[in-house]
UniProtKB/Swiss-Prot annotation:
Catalytic activity field: a fatty acyl-[ACP] + phosphate = an acyl phosphate + holo-[ACP]
Keyword Glycoprotein: no
Parts forming coiled coils: none
Localization in the cell: Cytoplasm
UniProt protein name: Phosphate acyltransferase
EC number: 2.3.1.274
Length: 340
């Protein structure tokens, strides 16, 4: 699948360094690797200065630290964070994007709080009711954008329609697809299947001449290159994503066991190492970490809360790519023409 051409212009990304499950060390190590591999990249680590400076040791010319007095906890209600955590690492990282000191933000923190702060600080596209979490997942012959993955557990037909618009525009921006195939995730392919909101959204998309809507797909189609954009509500999407990640992890573990259990298995594994290596790389969820908060007028990437160094590095790369491809501007330019 062709991808959007990235111009290697200077980029600054703000990172919420304190909110992930694994602490700041993972973020700092990923940040150091990110600036090593990309000379055009500068990073702003937002968090407790003393802790970050200790982890950075001698520092780096393209990594600076911005002090944050507070941290949003994973179990904190978004409404509480919005009222009481305005000086948190998450809120300050987003404020740097709003103020033009950074072009994008990465956080492994509380998803609901990130959405709430994003809507409050960076603002939404005009006409978009709710943001959506979108992610590129590997498929049989390419990759597929799936959204929403947990921002909104209840979505109306209008919400689903708007997710489809944003997903289609994102696929065009990132993968340079002129007519990405857009589908709704459902319990069957027949028109009568699904709840009322899904059926109504299907009718709305079928009436939209500028969207290449192909109808319903089932969960088993997500990885089969049937569609380029798959739309669902956040409840369904999050379960589908976590199930896929769980199956991938299981397959990786089973393969490792099969090729280490016996002398014969080790011999076969040695012969198959190049093929197995590529397969494991494709299935490894940490290599595909980083979901986009679509609907916000800026690049905001949600990392998995339990991300390791490799996964955090993938999220930083995703933020850089979206900034360099000007994804928010490209979506915003065309949304007005597509809105009902």
């Amino acid at each position: 699948m062709p991808h959007g051409r990235v111009v290697n212009t200077p980029v600054t990304i703000a990172i919420d360094a304190m909110s992930g499950d694994r602490g700041a060390a993972v973020v700092v190590h990923a940040a150091l690797e990110a600036v090593r591999e990309n000379e055009a990249l500068s990073l702003v680590l937002v968090g407790i200065r003393s802790e970050l400076e200790a982890l950075l040791h001698e520092g780096h010319a393209r990594i600076r630290i911005v002090e944050a007095a507070d941290v949003v906890r994973m179990n904190e209600r978004p409404s509480h964070a919005l009222r009481h955590k305005k000086n948190s690492s998450m809120a300050i990282a987003l404020s740097l994007v709003r103020d033009g000191e950074a072009q994008g933000c990465v956080s492994a923190g509380n998803t609901g709080a990130l959405m709430a702060f994003g809507r409050s600080i960076i603002r939404m596209y005009p006409g978009i009711e709710r943001p959506a979490i979108a992610k590129l997942i590997p498929s049989l012959r390419g990759r597929c954008h799936v959204l929403d993955l947990g921002a909104n557990v209840d979505s109306t037909a209008e919400n689903l329609y708007q997710y489809a618009l944003m997903g289609s525009l994102m696929a065009s921006a990132i993968c340079r697809q002129s007519e990405p195939r857009v589908a709704l995730l459902n319990v069957g392919e027949e028109e009568i299947k699904g709840n009322e909101q899904v059926r109504l959204a299907s009718h709305m998309l079928a009436q939209c001449d500028t969207i290449n809507y192909i109808g319903y797909v089932e969960g088993s189609d997500l990885f089969r290159d049937v569609a380029d954009v798959v739309v669902c509500d956040g409840f369904v999407g999050n379960i589908a994503l976590k199930t896929g990640e769980g199956v991938a992890g299981l397959l990786i573990e089973l393969l490792e066991q099969a090729f280490t259990r016996s002398m014969y298995g080790r011999f076969v594994g040695l012969l198959a190492r190049p093929i197995i290596g590529r397969l494991l790389q494709l299935m490894d969820p940490s290599r595909h970490n980083g979901a986009s908060l679509l609907g916000l007028q800026g690049v905001v990437i949600k990392s998995h809360g339990n991300a390791n160094e490799r996964a955090m590095l993938a999220a930083i790369r995703q933020a850089v790519r979206e900034v360099q491809l000007e994804v928010p501007r490209r979506i915003n330019e065309r949304l007005d023409d597509l809105m009902l």
